[in-house]
């Protein structure tokens, strides 16, 4: 429980800046790292060990979770001094009916600071309260020793505050592999194709979702019974929108102590 609330607070602090940098594009909140762990590690998360936010970063990690059930919530304020009511809310849950498969669900709600609508003479016609949301359902399963795959279906809805409402569907596909190289050391590899699907149509032309391909690797080193170190690196290729197409990369490290404290950087 302490870890749960600590993740909420850290996520709020670390992710305010990334959200500010991407909120200009259609459904850009889908590109925001929702959890404190991978955000603190430079955004690298596709090859990390499983936790509840694996439902979003790579659902193929979930069959290897040590817990049968998990639930989490993160709150990410955006430019609080300028837009006090703008934030991204994320909730995720997963369940493992057995040791080989997992089902997951998540919900993201991005509320934006509203503004007044006026006519040419300055008369107030109403208030705009734009918001976006996405709801996911995923299924993951091990297909060989150390290897799992996942498929996630996503519904995306965007309401700019006018009568126009844009909505579409997309999917994520993930792959995860882990291999023990010693009694307390292992390596993991992850791949994810995210937000592959339709476009948002606001009535004045389509706007593409942020299609991305991610691949990464991680090394988990058990330094002792109470201490551990994880090193990870990840590369990402953005396919759409076409004007943002290109490569990016991230890397990070995590030091764990007694299972209750983690120091991360990236």
Q: Which residues are covered by each model-predicted region?
A:
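Subset of outer-membrane beta-barrel
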Residues: 24-266
């Amino acid at each position: 429980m302490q870890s749960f609330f600590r993740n909420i607070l850290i996520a709020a602090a670390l992710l305010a800046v990334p959200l500010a940098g991407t909120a200009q594009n259609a459904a850009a909140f889908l590109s925001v790292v929702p959890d404190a762990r991978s955000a603190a590690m430079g955004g690298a998360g596709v090859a990390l060990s499983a936790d509840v936010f694996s439902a979003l970063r790579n659902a193929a990690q979930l069959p290897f979770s040590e817990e049968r059930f998990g639930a989490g919530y993160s709150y990410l304020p955006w430019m609080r001094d300028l837009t006090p009511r703008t934030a991204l809310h994320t909730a995720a849950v997963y369940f493992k009916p057995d040791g080989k498969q997992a089902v997951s669900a998540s919900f993201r709600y991005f509320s934006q600071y509203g503004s007044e609508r006026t006519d040419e003479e300055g008369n107030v016609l109403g208030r705009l309260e734009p918001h976006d949301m996405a709801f996911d359902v995923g299924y993951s399963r091990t297909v060989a020793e150390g290897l799992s795959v996942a498929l996630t279906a996503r519904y995306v809805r965007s309401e700019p505050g006018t009568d126009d409402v844009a909505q579409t569907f997309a999917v994520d596909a993930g792959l995860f592999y882990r291999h023990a190289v010693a009694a307390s050391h292992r390596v993991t590899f992850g791949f994810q194709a995210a937000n592959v699907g339709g476009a948002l149509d606001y009535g004045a032309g389509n706007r593409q979702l942020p299609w991305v391909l991610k691949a990464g690797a991680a090394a988990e080193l058990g330094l002792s019974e109470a201490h551990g170190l994880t090193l990870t690196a990840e590369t990402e290729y953005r396919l759409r929108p076409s004007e943002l197409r290109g490569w990016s990369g991230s890397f990070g490290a995590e030091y764990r102590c007694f299972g209750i404290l983690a120091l991360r950087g990236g």
